[in-house]
Amino acid sequence: YHSNGTIYEKNSFPGGHARSHNDNGFVFDEGIHVLHTKNKYILELLKKIGANLQFRERDAWIVSHGAMTRYPFQANTYGLPTDIVKDCLIGFIENDFTQTDKKKNYQDWTYYMFGKGIAEHFMIPYSKKFWGVDPKLLTTDWVNVRHPRPSLDEVITGAIQDQSKRFGINGNYRYPETYGFGNIAESLENA
């Protein structure tokens, strides 16, 4: 399978930023990596190369406004300061989805999908940090599957109590049993 391809690497090891390193017995992934594909071909390929993936459930948290709340923020404002929760709820409720012509970039899409509170208290600042560019410069063709829009009931529930429902495409994922995400690149190299 694919034995006639050439792979170019900047470093002397495989994986680029999808690698792991060991520091005093602790394994660190170079970046945030989880595998949530449902593509049977990819899953079979990973099995063939011996990537030894485990199925896991996401348990991710966000530190925001001096508190910890579950990921994703848009469905889990419980525990945040009351004024932040109120802004997020009001913004989500007031959002009427009539401004369809104003979704030309990621920032506009964020306001459109989640309302002013969620956009300004989390999505926009986090996007600037994560992507390193102004959200007005990002396109929107990738976001619907990556950023789930919870129902109003889910937003209200997530504001008044801790909810453990997993939203989005990576609520369940696969991750190597040993040596972090870099195990996949090393398995490919040795296949």
Task: Tell me the role of every PLM-derived stretch.
Residues 18-22, 39, 123:
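Short, flexible helix/strand-to-coil boundary loops that buttress conserved ligand/catalytic motifs
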Residues 17-18, 33, 68, 182:
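Gly/Ser/Thr-rich beta-alpha loop segments that engage phosphate groups in nucleotides
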Residues 1-5, 49-51, 190-191:
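Short glycine/proline-enriched coil/turn segments at helix->beta-strand junctions
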Residues 12-14, 69, 128-129:
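Short, solvent-exposed loop/turn segments at secondary-structure junctions
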